[in-house]
């Protein structure tokens, strides 16, 4: 069901109103940059890599956890579907969410990911696992568009696509490396169990949430007032 949802967009596409594109204002953030701001780009890439790595713990390890809890095997598929459905949800009400959390939006999003992972690592109840998948997906889906938007800002219009390609590349890198990083950690620490990946990344994410709270005025971890002041 989740994977058929893009068909809704295709069906509605003929009803979109076409507007002629207007030049970027000379005073915009993009036009102030002559080249890509590499330090900011690297920090955005690192942040995107980590939240992707942490959130994808659910997709890689939920099946093992569900099996260990002796729940129906199909339930892991339900959890993963809910996770991806929750990733889509913030885009529908993004402005409202930013209006509520304002400068703490990234803090809240990272905290949601961490809380979702802890739900998997601590609770055995089906309801809490559903809550965990929804929280982690919602937090991840909230941060994605913000990272993409910040990436576009740090580059002039002619280089914005290149900057975005670098950021999106680390998404696939995180997908590829996630199981290897977690398995390496478990081998080095001799910690084993179906809950370990969730508790490990839950603690790492909690640490990042604390850092984001302390550095909420930072370009990467914070959110500029221009996002919520009209």
PLM-predicted stretches and their roles:
Residues 40-81, 87:
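Extracytoplasmic gate region of multi-pass secondary transporters
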